[in-house]
């Protein structure tokens, strides 16, 4: 990097920061935090515990956004000041220090850009993520288990928690079906871009002839619905089936039919839960999963109407990403149209940049 490149970088980042300021409106956030502080000092505020919890959640989100905003703004302001001083004093070491810190500033601005993009109502919610292997038996079921590990590692890297709601092991390897509750900051905002069909091309470890196989798995992501979102589901709208639950690989086979499968008749949406030995608790969790799925479907319908897309095109049936292991190694996302060569790292959960590239490309379009 030379002086010209660094000067242009600072100009570009300053412009981005100015745009971010216009969207974030930090002054309004500070005022909102001050208002909530006043409310919290009122004894009446705590009488309604559910409302108090919602207001405090709002305060936490405002404070989190302000913290990230200030980190980015201070970084760019400090960099400009330090660079001007280095040029005035013709300090080559200080100029080199500025150049070395460029990537850190870019990362902070990018983090803030993503924060701005994750501003929809449910982006801050926890996520319910389900993986379903396509046709292809053991090969597809193994691919589903690879995706499961990728998402669990991704959540782990971000400090999010993962709860298995439903798990059905494959006959020989892999999984037939799995649903997770992933809890963490902006979990749904990030994971919503994973909705769709994931395609794998590799030489199958299950083929003695070592032939290349193509496998598919669908990923469905819904926001965990808060109690303040009212979704009414009547008993006549659903069909409830019970079955015996089993853990991963068949452990802890339950002799009673505690596992629950709920089918929403009108939409055909199916959810199931077997993470608890109590049928009552599994039903409650399955109903929550169903509400989340229906809410996600309604959000997609609304977006489609605005964009003029036919409802028949909505859903989780579009291929979004290809993972090629042979004859070369590459992962390509169809939304961002970006290819990645760090296949092993991505399958080990390093999917942050890939997700963020999709968010940015969707915003531009």
Swiss-Prot record:
GO terms for molecular function: translation release factor activity, codon specific. Methylated by PrmC. Methylation increases the termination efficiency of RF2. GO terms for cellular component: cytoplasm. Gene3D superfamilies: 3.30.160.20, 3.30.70.1660, Release factor. Pfam families: PCRF, RF-1. Its main location: cytoplasm. Peptide chain release factor 2 directs the termination of translation in response to the peptide chain termination codons UGA and UAA. NCBIfam families: prfB. This is Peptide chain release factor 2.
